[in-house]
Swiss-Prot record:
Residues binding a divalent metal cation 1, per UniProt: 215, 226, 426
InterPro entries: Creatinase/aminopeptidase-like (IPR036005), Met_Aminopeptidase_Type2 (IPR050247), Pept_M24 (IPR000994), Pept_M24_MAP (IPR001714), Pept_M24A_MAP2 (IPR002468), Pept_M24A_MAP2_BS (IPR018349), WH-like_DNA-bd_sf (IPR036388), WH_DNA-bd_sf (IPR036390)
Keyword match Metal-binding: yes
Residue ranges of the region described as Disordered: 1-80
Pfam family, one: Peptidase_M24
Functional summary from the UniProt entry: Cotranslationally removes the N-terminal methionine from nascent proteins. The N-terminal methionine is often cleaved when the second residue in the primary sequence is small and uncharged (Met-Ala-, Cys, Gly, Pro, Ser, Thr, or Val).
Residues annotated as binding substrate: 195, 303
Entry's EC annotation: 3.4.11.18
Family per similarity comment: Belongs to the peptidase M24A family. Methionine aminopeptidase eukaryotic type 2 subfamily.
UniProt name for this protein: Methionine aminopeptidase 2
Organism: Paracoccidioides brasiliensis (strain Pb03)
Subcellular localization(s) per the UniProt record: Cytoplasm
Transmembrane portions of the chain: none
Length: 445
């Protein structure tokens, strides 16, 4: 999804020391208490031997109790163990740490910047919690997703895992605002690049020849981790996926404090468009989708709010610079089609506008639905399945009324030309004062 938010450093809770400590934490639960030592113990009822009887009385055999082994807590498949029980000290793994280069190289060793980075560690802990949930859920999903599954099964399986690992089922009022799913799970097939999740009754089935973008987010107290990957079963699409993964990693490498957006976009496009893919005997250049962007991420605002910034994936963008303390989703999209998307298909994604006008609503259904949205999602995006799950029904008229009045935004699926194939990879990065942290980085991508 796209975005804006310029979080000042004063609003950040960044602590590099907490992340380093996380490396030493094993994902185990507390061990059971060990059994007491019993060497040399005798039965109290055993009497002294009678005089002259040297054989009748015998010492009772020692009873050596076996020590109980501690039970290691590990994640289940599918993931259902709350993450805090695997990390009882609440110290979660750090992401990939990248030192700043060139004119910003001094930040890595500058004591003032290091001190600033150690402040407000709650911010970093919440981000790392969300990132570890994302890693564990997606790593299982990449193994479990197979042709023949419905898109609804795939999306809901991911969402149930996120709810379980964060400990926020989201059924009680306000629970989803404390943690859980940050936005609807995108399961975008082939020419559809973004913003598609199945509505109720959807029967679409994943096929072997499909290319599916899986885009989901996790948040803890509004600290959103946004990351996406692409699945293709047929190796014919390998170059398409490689191009987009390379482009995303190039964008991450280029990103940093005082770096211009236009420079990042140019580097991304150059990396991506150096690839081509052959499908059924025809070679297609991989094109960067020029009207899709990365974005800043704000608290409870996936696209950063009214002051958010966009990160282009083609050359020629504006001269805006990245700033210290900002959080970015670096995402790139490649296509075998035109490299341009448009609205298409049935809308499923919605979000309440942060600075929506105070409009008098005439429809009672719209008033009631707005109350449900505010108390359960705030400004986090939601989909129609989430309203169904909360027991809402016959809400479409009210929802459309909220959209028409400029209170809720609708995000239709974004698609290139039919017959084309698109791919996406995405990571969330934190521009900390002294280092750049790719918070969502994992062994998978």
């Amino acid at each position: 999804m796209a975005a804006q938010v310029a979080s000042g450093v004063g609003n950040l809770n960044l602590n590099s020391e907490g992340g380093a400590a996380a490396k030493n934490i094993s994902a185990q639960g507390s061990p059971e208490n060990e059994a007491r030592e019993s060497d040399g113990e005798y039965d109290d009822d055993q009497g002294a031997p009678e005089l002259g009887n040297t054989t009748a009385a015998k010492k009772k055999k020692k009873k050596t109790k076996k020590k109980k082994k501690g039970t290691s807590k590990v994640q289940t498949e599918p993931p259902r163990v709350i993450l805090s029980s695997l990390f009882p000290n609440n110290q979660y793994p750090e992401g990939e740490i990248i030192e700043y280069q060139n004119e910003n190289a001094y930040r890595t060793t500058n004591e003032e910047k290091r001190h600033l980075d150690r402040m407000n560690n709650d911010f970093l802990a919440e981000y790392r919690y969300a990132a570890e949930v994302h890693r564990q859920v997606r790593q299982y999903s990449q193994k479990a997703i197979k042709p023949g599954q419905t898109l609804t099964e795939i999306a809901e399986g991911i969402e149930e895992s996120v709810r379980a690992l964060t400990g926020h089922p989201g059924l009680e009022e306000g629970d989803n605002l404390r943690g859980g799913i940050a936005f609807p799970t995108g399961v975008n097939l082939n020419h559809c690049a973004a913003h598609y999740t199945p509505n109720a009754g959807n029967k679409m089935v994943l096929q072997y020849e499909d290319v599916m973008k899986v885009d989901f987010g996790v948040h803890i107290n509004g600290r959103i981790v946004d990351s996406a990957f692409t699945i293709a079963f047929d190796p014919v699409y390998d170059n398409l996926l490689a191009a987009v993964k390379d482009a995303t990693n190039t964008g991450i490498k280029q990103a940093g404090i005082d770096v211009r957006m236009s420079d990042i976009g140019a580097a991304i496009q150059e990396a991506m468009e150096s690839y081509e893919v052959e499908i059924k005997g025809t070679s297609y250049p991989v094109k960067a989708i020029r009207n899709l962007n990365g974005h800043t991420i704000g608290r409870y605002e996936i696209h950063g709010g009214k002051n958010g910034k966009s990160v282009p994936i083609v050359k020629g963008g504006d001269q805006t610079k990245m700033e210290e303390g900002e959080v970015y989703a670096i995402e790139t999209f490649g296509s075998t089609g035109r490299g341009y998307v448009r609205d298409d298909m049935e809308t499923s994604h919605y979000a309440k506008i942060p600075d929506a006008p105070n409009v008098p609503l005439r429809l009672s259904s719209a008033k009631n639905l707005l109350n449900v949205i505010t108390k359960n999602f705030g400004t986090l995006p939601f989909c129609r399945r989430y309203l169904d799950r909360l027991g809402q029904d016959k809400y479409l008229l009210g929802l459309n009324n909220l959209v028409a009045n400029g209170i809720v935004d609708a995000y239709p699926p974004l698609c290139d030309v039919k017959g084309s194939y698109t791919a996406q990879f995405e990571h969330t990065i934190l521009l900390r004062p002294n280092v750049k942290e790719v918070i969502s980085r994992g062994d998978d991508y």
